[in-house]
Amino acid sequence: MMQTVLAKIVADKAIWVEARKQQQPLASFQNEVQPSTRHFYDALQGARTAFILECKKASPSKGVICDDFDPARIAAIYKHYASAISVLTDEKYFQGSFDFLPIVSQIAPQPILCKDFIIDPYQIYLARYYQADACLLMLSVLDDEQYRQLAAVAHSLKMGVLTEVSNEEELERAIALGAKVVGINNRDLRDLSIDLNRTRELAPKLGHNVTVISESGINTYAQVRELSHFADGFLIGSALMAHDDLHAAVRRVLLGENKVCGLTRGQDAKAAYDAGAIYGGLIFVATSPRCVNVEQAQEVMAAAPLQYVGVFRNHDIADVLDKAKVLSLVAVQLHGNEDQLYIDTLREALPAHVAIWKALSVGETLPARELQHVDKYVLDNGQGGSGQRFDWSLLNGQSLGNVLLAGGLGADNCVEAAQTGCAGLDFNSAVESQPGIKDARLLASVFQTLRAY
């Protein structure tokens, strides 16, 4: 039995459909509906994990997620990363619209999925008329006969169907109904709770001829890497929509929160950004072969829209504050013996939006991460720049959501590093041709390796 949130949404949807039929009768546009030429099923095939990225302004569980919602801007970013793009068209609960479909379709070449509570063939014709290439059919909402009828309409228009299940009974029905792409919703639409175990438990019951998509509650690279053993792809919306920097938000989930440190040239910053990095590191430590001054840093920054982090070691606080301000750094990374008093003083004087990162040297044991006002830790072997790794087995069982891993990371070991569960990786010497000179091919290779799952 459907109850609560879902039942209310479906009851309201029936009212909406009848009103829309009056306003825009099927007969007024059915002759103009052309079959889709973008193949949803094919787009999700292939060796790499697929990503259906979602345009979503609001949801019943979170309210408004994205204030300045602009489907054209979102599509222009998603088209660089997505296998398919999902567009919420439900008005009442998600502040969606069918008008968003052609906007997204015009900008992005990928198949467009109409995400709605579909209960009537009319909605599928409407979706295709507005340029959707696939539609969502939810087995929590439809009985088998309704599903067959709606799927047949979609397939007659050469549209794909994402068949959504949320429990074992619906999964068995999806198998019996011959669903080609099954979305396992980790959110229980009856009470809106999230349980990622649903993907782990249900996905293995589906055959190899079925494409499995894990939906809801996916918001980190560590989750994606782990769940990619169970699912062929992911549908991700809320985790992306809440961020101002959408490029960085997508990269964070697909590749991790990765940084390329020791940038000294604009072309290297561009190569790092093009490869998939989020952060660029600028080193202000005089003894480093990668040290830059403010003018050099500005040249580097002008070349690529990375989020820039300044690296300092036992600097005067006034110097750190000055560079953070002049360069609009997103974070300052402390590599010396800065203690709690130093960090407290710095925090009080820094603008609130500038984060404090602390590098810790790992020897025989893992140092404590108990400093106040530290937003991220960078775990390295020694003082950094050594090109050597520490014993990563020390990270087993640790909570690493605010940790970047550093020390000799390159294409040969970045996957093993990512599998530790750290938020991201910090690349430097192993992506260089000589100290301070990055190699664009090595950078590209590292990020291609990180995305090969």
UniProtKB/Swiss-Prot annotation:
Residues 1-257 are annotated as: Indole-3-glycerol phosphate synthase. Its EC number is 4.1.1.48, 5.3.1.24. Residues 258-453 are annotated as: N-(5'-phosphoribosyl)anthranilate isomerase. It catalyses: N-(5-phospho-beta-D-ribosyl)anthranilate = 1-(2-carboxyphenylamino)-1-deoxy-D-ribulose 5-phosphate; 1-(2-carboxyphenylamino)-1-deoxy-D-ribulose 5-phosphate + H(+) = (1S,2R)-1-C-(indol-3-yl)glycerol 3-phosphate + CO2 + H2O. It comes from the Bacteria. Keywords: Amino-acid biosynthesis, Aromatic amino acid biosynthesis, Decarboxylase, Isomerase, Lyase, Multifunctional enzyme, Tryptophan biosynthesis. Pathway: Amino-acid biosynthesis; L-tryptophan biosynthesis; L-tryptophan from chorismate: step 3/5; Amino-acid biosynthesis; L-tryptophan biosynthesis; L-tryptophan from chorismate: step 4/5. It holds the Pfam family PRAI. GO terms for molecular function: indole-3-glycerol-phosphate synthase activity; phosphoribosylanthranilate isomerase activity. One of its GO terms (biological process) is L-tryptophan biosynthetic process. In the N-terminal section; belongs to the TrpC family. In the C-terminal section; belongs to the TrpF family. Bifunctional enzyme that catalyzes two sequential steps of tryptophan biosynthetic pathway. The first reaction is catalyzed by the isomerase, coded by the TrpF domain; the second reaction is catalyzed by the synthase, coded by the TrpC domain. Monomer. PANTHER family: INDOLE-3-GLYCEROL-PHOSPHATE SYNTHASE, TRYPTOPHAN BIOSYNTHESIS PROTEIN. This is Tryptophan biosynthesis protein TrpCF. It comes from Escherichia coli O157:H7.
